[in-house]
């Protein structure tokens, strides 16, 4: 069980798979869900307004989007070369997917439940940083990455739990979420390989992303040099003012046809 779902091992014909049963919003302990949903596109304007108002219909739509976000992310990340469970579909709040197993055929342990050598920690950390980069290359930040959301099978780390995954280009908190994800993983692996604790992968990755230089197979260094140039305060204030005016105009447009 987790903070947003209960997970079961189930039989599907001759196959053993994993069924993730999402909890209702009021029963989830996942904090600040609205922050994670920022930037998720909803093309239907009526649906979007209902979600913003929090009506019964709107809450139902929000739940569907929350659940479908994980399925969409799993397919997208698998295609990008990130190791994730294979999804088989999501119906009525139940996500059916591949069961990740260890070398003995048992359910693979969470990363937080294993110990490892310094050499293995460095190698697995390198792989996880590679997966973070590949996620970002397709516009996704995990948003809740830690040793509790990574499984370890005989081939290495497998990333799980993605309903809160955010759109890197559309979510204002994407950089801070990526930084937290990277630092969580670095601090964990740093218990076994202390040399990792002095690295600055989060800053390096985000700078490359913003510069349009991030590549799925890029060789990271873990180093980052701060820009010592002064910020253009007037430009920042102008952008803030424009954003406020845009939001006020949006709210004004909504008034005549509220649900």
Predicted regions located by residue number:
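Regulatory N- and C-terminal appendages and interdomain linkers associated
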Residues: 1, 119, 127, 134-138, ...
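Amphipathic alpha-helical transducer elements in NTP-driven molecular machines
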Residues: 64-71, 122-125, 175, 179-182
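Conserved ATP-binding subdomain of kinase catalytic cores across diverse folds
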Residues: 1-107, 137
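Catalytic-loop of the protein kinase fold
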Residues: 84, 137-147, 152
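Catalytic activation segment of kinase domains across protein kinase-like and atypical kinase folds
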Residues: 13-24, 30, 101, 107-114, ...
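A glycine-rich phosphate-binding loop feature that marks nucleotide/adenosyl-phosphate handling sites
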Residues: 93-95, 149-152, 202-208
